[in-house]
Amino acid sequence: MSEAKITPSRHSYVKDRLQDSLNRFIKHESFGGVLLAFCVGAAMLVANSSYADMYFTFFHSEFGAFFSDSHFKVSLQDFINDVLMSFFFLLVGLEMKREMLYGELAGFKKVSFSFLAAFGGIICPVMIYSYFNSGTAYESGFGVAMSTDTAFALGLIMLLGDRVPKILKIFLVTLAVADDLGAISVIAIFYSDNINMQWIYASLILVAVLIYLNYRDTKYLSLYFLAGILLWFCVHHSGIHVTIAAVILAMAIPGRTRVNKKYFINMLKEFERMKVATNDWNDVVYARESEKVGFWRGSFKNIRSFIFGNQDVEKKIDMAKTSQLVHMLDTIGTYSRYAQNPLIRLEIALQPICAYFFVPLFAFANAGVTLEGNIDISLNSVMLGTILGLVVGKPVGVLLFCFLGEKLNLATRPKDLNYLHILSVGMISGIGFTMSMFVANLAYKDDIMSIDMSKISILVASSIAAVLGLLVVYLSTIKQDNQLENINEEDEIQKLKETQSII
């Protein structure tokens, strides 16, 4: 078989896998957004009910281990925020790498458009928040106003179903991925303290190990996870936030699919051996046909075979032949695993558990805020900076930087993506929720009042951004429907004129 015939099929296979991965991501994230909204609502209800003390006591309860005079303990909330959410940031890192290697972020002009949009969506909210809080005790909370919750955002646009063009969904995903990269960078730089250089050096050694594993194109994910766990431990003790360890691990996971010619030939040989061993697959067909008998008939046949074994010759099993077939299947499975893309395989495994368990659990553990009457929400600079940053700063920044990037020829706007779409994505990216709450816990640390005020602001801002974003998306799709109707009418008129000219 010639190389020319192999190449298109390989490109088609990779393209199909990437398309399936993107669709699977959108599916998980959209349903995860609905589940996330339920968890936020449940947390708010419980935190303001008679079960509030039980709720807060449960998530602040500590557990750990001890050895001799040494002991280690952590609260359940810290375990969720630092350990379980590391898997979420690992998934974010994998998505970023996939998009930059094969997806909508591949190529400088393409990646620069999404990164410019994300950069604008970071700079403008930070400027607005800093305007209200510069020089105050709350100025460290600027990172709260710049984060996007991808799950909520995708869950929102899925409410409109097929009305939402696919390019809008893809742009939202790539913008959110680039936005997460910016948020992670801000966390690593501005929300890390008491840096311990010895642990930094240990972390750098482990980063070198991960780079070497990637260079050797090691396919065993267990080796990466072992190095990643050690890296997480070192980064945690270094004073830098552990999210950076998860992203570094993601960047080290190989993103190549290498189909070795030797493995491919060996797989074909195993298939030929199975074909011969099963009498040109006839034994397999007969075995499947024999299994199609009913439950009662099959049970009676098995009992009769057990009691009168010599009378049912057909049920005798050739153990040597069966073992040979099992060995062949194991060999084919091994070669198949060698050919799989580790990045996509790990991403597919992490998507459902993050969307359905880790992120909703984080939301339920952190969204519980007690609404007390003595909180002055009308004049608080934290609330004004957060709400205006997310609701106004996000769409203005995204739209402005996309426009400047295209006009200055720094980036290429994707085909079929208009500026009304970009505005709607900017509105939707103002939904902060989990990412903003995550940053709020880091920014205000032990200031419970500021954390609660920030969380209330996030909930209000995200709700406003969701309503406005949904409205703008709907308006943009109405315009698209009208354009399609006009095109169809023009086609009908043209066909009518052609018919009349023929007559």
From Swiss-Prot:
Give the matching PANTHER family.
Answer: NA(+)_H(+) ANTIPORTER NHAA, SODIUM ION/PROTON ANTIPORTER NHAA-RELATED
Q: Which reaction does it catalyse?
A: Na(+)(in) + 2 H(+)(out) = Na(+)(out) + 2 H(+)(in)
Q: Where in the cell is it found?
A: Cell inner membrane
Say which species the protein is native to: Helicobacter hepaticus (strain ATCC 51449 / 3B1)
InterPro entries given for it? Na/H_antiporter_dom_sf (IPR023171), NhaA (IPR004670)
Which segments cross the bilayer?
Answer: 31-51, 74-94, 112-132, 141-161, 170-190, 195-215, 229-249, 348-368, 384-404, 420-440, 458-478
GO CC, alphabetical:
plasma membrane
Question: Which HAMAP family does this UniProt record tie to the protein?
Answer: NhaA
Provide the function of this protein: Na(+)/H(+) antiporter that extrudes sodium in exchange for external protons.
- Family, per entry: Belongs to the NhaA Na(+)/H(+) (TC 2.A.33) antiporter family.
The identity of this protein, by name, is: Na(+)/H(+) antiporter NhaA 1
Q: Which GO terms describe its biological process?
A: regulation of pH
| Alphabetized GO MF terms | sodium:proton antiporter activity
* Membrane topology listed for this record: Multi-pass membrane protein
Q: What is the protein's major site of localization?
A: membrane
Q: Which UniProt keywords apply?
A: Antiport, Cell inner membrane, Cell membrane, Ion transport, Membrane, Sodium, Sodium transport, Transmembrane, Transmembrane helix, Transport
